Amino acid sequence: MEDTHRSRTLQTLGLLTRGALHQIANPLVALVGSAELALGELDPGTKAHDRVALTHRTGTEIAEIVRALQGFVRLQAHGPERLSLSAAATDAIGLVSKVIPIHGVTLTTSGDATVVAPPGDVGSDLVELLVEALETADGTVELAVREEGGDAVVLATGGGERRFPAAAA
């Protein structure tokens, strides 16, 4: 019963997140576009130009975060497909580095393995693994991908791993 409730809660959270991201993205496009047009009308070096340039840069950064989160949420609807775990790990690193402050920490991947799994499940597992590793990180977090006994394994520096059934060759 508790698993069913948790599943419904997560599904509701996903729907709300998708809707919120959409509602944020639309006015953000107008904000960034208006700032870009205004920059062309202002003299460089003026306070007004600098303020509008800051608005444009900040809006662009927020738009990148929104796009990354939208992509992550969209993955949740995909069924199983053939995936490179290294590519999925790189995508997870891209998302985490956009939305979580990771100052002084380098995120890297090494190795590769292929799995057949829903990309949303793989992405969620890898983001969770990264977040756990970042809690104790001191310098570098590496996601090492390898095949081990019929499984594709992703190991995080400092502990933690996720296992997926390796795809048949």
Where are these regions (language model features)?
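Conserved HAMP-HisKA connector
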Residues: 1-23, 32
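Core catalytic ATP-binding domain of two-component histidine kinases
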Residues: 29, 33, 40, 46-169
